[in-house]
């Protein structure tokens, strides 16, 4: 990978309420800002290559932001707009999760998901989700009628009219996933700097 430019990072260090410091972190091929699940996953992927990479996190550990407070659902991919990057990554990430859980030893359960429709007039919305999912490449999507839905989930409301069933959806432990990704990236050579906040980016001439 060719280094296209240099970035000087102005950072703030938080160490027991000490005075704010300004520091140059040095030269890297890639700087990743944030050690949440997206940052950790990016770091792990980059650790496969001959790239000098560093993850900068303003908190004291990984998984201290949005990644610690989410629904833990591994979505099937029917909700993202057709043809979007989100749709592509959602479906691909879903397909990767089972093997990742085995490789990195974090809990994952493929238990499927249901989008329940309570009224017949809502069926066009359910059908739209189904069509979008098929277009996005989601496998095994089905629309269940009320009888099929009751057989699958006896505790569902009697008002349920139909449901979109996505068997490829699942749940994961977001903490263990984030930590496992970061640990693996670090073992493979990616550096992590905590208690460090990026406050500005200034491009400078290479030379």
For the regions a language model picked out, list residue spans one by one:
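Glycine-rich FAD pyrophosphate-binding loop
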Residues: 47-69
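Dinucleotide-binding Rossmann-like beta1-alpha1 core, especially the glycine-rich loop
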Residues: 72-152, 161
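N-terminal Rossmann-like FAD-binding beta1-loop-alpha1 element of flavoenzymes
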Residues: 28-55
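Short phosphate-binding/catalytic loops that engage adenosine nucleotides
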Residues: 51, 138, 190
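Extreme N-terminal leader/targeting segments of oxidoreductases
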Residues: 2-30, 48
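Helical element adjacent to the flavin cofactor pocket in flavoenzyme catalytic cores
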Residues: 164-207
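Short loop/edge segments at beta-strand edges and connector loops
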Residues: 57, 110, 145, 194-196
């Amino acid at each position: 990978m060719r280094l296209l430019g240099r970035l000087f990072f102005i950072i703030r260090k938080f160490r027991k309420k000490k005075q704010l410091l300004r520091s140059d972190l040095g030269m890297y091929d890639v700087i990743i800002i944030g050690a949440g699940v997206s940052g950790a996953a990016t770091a792990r992927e980059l650790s496969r290559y001959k790239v000098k990479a560093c993850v900068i996190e303003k908190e004291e550990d990984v998984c201290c932001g949005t990644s610690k407070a989410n629904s833990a659902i591994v979505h099937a991919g029917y909700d993202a707009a057709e043809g979007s990057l989100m749709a592509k990554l959602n479906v691909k990430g879903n397909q990767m999760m089972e093997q990742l859980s085995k490789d990195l030893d974090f809990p994952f359960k493929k238990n499927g998901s249901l989008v329940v429709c309570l009224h017949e007039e809502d069926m066009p919305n359910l059908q739209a989700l189904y069509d979008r999912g098929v277009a996005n490449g989601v496998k095994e999507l089905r629309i269940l009628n009320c009888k099929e839905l009751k057989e699958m989930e006896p505790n569902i409301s009697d008002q349920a009219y139909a449901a979109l069933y996505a068997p490829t959806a699942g749940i994961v432990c977001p903490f263990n996933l984030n930590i496992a990704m970061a640990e693996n990236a670090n073992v493979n050579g990616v550096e992590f700097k905590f208690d460090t906040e990026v406050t500005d980016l200034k491009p400078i001439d290479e030379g």
